[in-house]
């Protein structure tokens, strides 16, 4: 059975140890930790912080994962930049360095999974968007693919050495935004891609039109190692509380049970951080009702 978890980007106004205790008290069995400027910043580690988090998580029997979606950690002016797809090799190296540090952090915390995404390409080219085939320059798309495929093997090697699984998340608006793009990345990486897991955000599937969500979960079963839970309304990429959008939460959880998924299913509600404790409690209530349905 999978474990219900919560992403700390939805508790960004809480101290990390307080967040772990709160989530455990609410019944969560895991925490997806998003390193950021005020939470386990891998560029400015605080003495004893990692060990304190690891010990408390163990005491509370919380399974941990590490998420790498911090908005402005690498650049205070540009959200989610630089990426692995930048024109500048130095910029690509900055993202790769952050990902390596996040892998190290996960290993030190005892977390088994690190999630990542491709980032947006500099000129907006998409690998897998249904409406991009006629508009994008195929040669430019191949150049972006070449960059991504060149950056992935060293990261996969580092993760393997540290005993951590990399989970790649298709993200709307980024170069790889659909499960089909993940499949293509794994194909292009060949044998090196065998270790790459899939991080599936069920809300994103409503944005990109990859539905029914339950069917996508079943098709992805063999590569699925991490799951994000959130609702989406009208196909707009804004994470919402369950019940505020179009997601059939019972369908999602039933599909995860049917495929015998064993990883974390982590609620991701970063836009609700201003009411983080209340949102985490509400989300758990929705999850419990859906599991009983």
Model-predicted segments: where are they?
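Short acidic, glycine/proline-enriched helix-loop-strand junctions
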Residues: 41-63, 132-134, 138, 164
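Short, conserved active-site loops that position catalytic residues or coordinate cofactors/metal ions
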Residues: 26-37, 66-79
